Amino acid sequence: MRVLSIVHEHDAGPGVFADVAHERAEEVVEWIPARQAPPAAEGFEAALVFGGAMHVDQDDGHGWLPAEKQLLRSLLGLGTPALGVCLGAQLLAEVAGGGARRMTRPEIGWTLVELTGEAATDPLLGPLPARFEGFQWHSYEASPPDGALSLARSDACLQAFSLTGAPWWGIQFHAEVTSETIAGWIAGYRSDEDAVRANVNWDAVLLETNQKIARWNTRGIGICRRFLDHAASLLVAEAQA
């Protein structure tokens, strides 16, 4: 299996998903849209789309965004399974016919996430506890197209969705993140406008991270494994059809 890993920024990479991808795939192709021309959509059996500080409506400020969206449209047309995280989830929602919108208040830190009833049979999120704490850092929220399944929510926004008729999932929470990444984000972005608006207690976030990251990484690894295993099962089914 050949997996496309779309990384928007050096400090927003695949995290704990990286080892899973290399474990499950024969080849992992990392694409950094701001630096490289897009690869051909054909030839990938799965795609992972990660986060970034930019937003889905900033095509003018990030000239590579339209090309990425076109590549994602091609992947959707081919039926290629995709899992988007944070910005990645918002991009998948927009490309599929929905969008993303700015939130009244950014969501940063550890928050309670609750699965919906529709998540019970979902191959990715179904094995998770009905309620869990997940790590967040976002000021936009995904608005998936009509017909998409809402799989999880927090008090602030939709946290996970899947498309009907296509093997695409979006998760707003950062299931891929490591403790080192969180510390780096706090050091680099704590003075940003959105972080200031959120009025975050950074010492508390770091303390919670130390307490919760091991379990969180286990859950993130599980989500990525189940996604790639599902993608592999679709390949087997296609070969047997």
Question: Which residues make up each language-model segment?
Answer:
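Hydrophobic/aromatic beta-strand patches that form the interior of the parallel beta-sheet core
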Residues: 4, 29-31, 48, 83, ...
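Pocket-forming structural segment of enzyme catalytic cores
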Residues: 96-180
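C-terminal helical/coil "lid" or tail adjacent to the Rossmann-like core of SAM-dependent
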Residues: 166, 175-209
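Cysteine-nucleophile active-site neighborhood
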Residues: 50-119
